């Protein structure tokens, strides 16, 4: 199959997905029959108010359900495999490898006792995508592509030794290191000031385009999603 056709084919196909959450001693609908299609190299903006179910849906695209949630109907097709029907042990081969996640709080995602370079390369080495030497060279290239200062040495620092905007970009490098097919950005710039937010968004957009990675960008900010996304979906009351 040609690369052109591969890009045209859906990477993720979500069909009539229904998810419930448990609260007040009963199950409540969160996602109510959502349909989505995401192609390789495409950035989908997922926008909605707080509590609309954006993060639940974004994680579900990776086949992951948060504690207290359950899938009650529909399909999550990843290159034809229905993630909704797989056991967690079967989905482990995708998580942190072919699918990665960038959270809102970079600081909470890093181990303060480990150098940035070691955390950036961990998945690529663990899944045997690259050896340690090649993974570190690639991490430096990612740092440079993300406009981090001193890309050849910033990885020797610890999380507390860089700014919030820099740490957010290192987390993007960590997510890109295994060259995933899908990356989910969950409001990763919310805690940053406006100037830093623009810098980080630009760097994220450029690197996703460079590696032809499909992405879901979750936010409540229309201006942010307009800068990142090729297509925008609005989630409201689970629809």
Show which residues each predicted segment covers:
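The feature captures the beta-strand-to-loop junction immediately N-terminal to the Walker
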Residues: 47-49
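Conserved ABC transporter NBD signature motif
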Residues: 70-82
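A short, proline-enriched helix->beta-strand linker immediately N-terminal to the Walker B motif
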Residues: 177-181
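Catalytic Walker B motif of ABC-type/P-loop ATPase nucleotide-binding domains
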Residues: 183-186
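Helical segment within the ABC ATPase nucleotide-binding domain
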Residues: 198-211
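A short, surface-exposed alpha-helical micro-motif characterized by mixed small hydrophobic
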Residues: 225-227
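Short, glycine/charged-rich "phosphate-handling" switch motifs in NTP-dependent
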Residues: 231
């Amino acid at each position: 199959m040609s690369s052109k056709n591969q890009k045209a084919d859906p990477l993720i196909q979500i069909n009539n997905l229904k998810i419930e959450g448990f609260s007040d001693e009963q199950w409540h609908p969160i996602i109510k029959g959502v349909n989505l299609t995401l192609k390789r190299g495409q950035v989908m903006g997922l926008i909605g108010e707080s509590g609309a179910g954006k993060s639940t849906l974004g994680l579900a695209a990776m086949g992951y359900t948060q504690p207290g949630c359950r899938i009650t109907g529909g399909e999550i097709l990843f290159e034809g495999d229905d993630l909704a029907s797989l056991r967690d042990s079967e989905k482990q081969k995708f998580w942190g490898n072919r699918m990665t996640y960038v959270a809102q709080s970079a600081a909470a995602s890093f181990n303060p006792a480990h150098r940035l370079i070691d955390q950036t390369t961990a998945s690529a080495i663990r899944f045997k995508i690259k050896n340690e030497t090649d993974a570190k060279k690639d991490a430096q290239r990612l740092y440079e592509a993300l406009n981090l200062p001193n890309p050849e040495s910033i990885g020797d620092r610890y999380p507390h030794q860089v700014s919030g905007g820099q740490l957010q970009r290192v987390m993007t490098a960590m997510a890109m290191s295994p060259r995933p097919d899908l990356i989910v950005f969950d409001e990763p710039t919310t805690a940053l000031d406006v100037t830093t937010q623009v810098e980080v968004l630009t760097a994220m957009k450029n690197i996703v385009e460079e590696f032809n990675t499909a992405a879901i960008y979750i936010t409540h900010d229309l201006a942010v999603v307009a800068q990142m996304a090729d297509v925008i979906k609005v989630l409201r009351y689970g629809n």
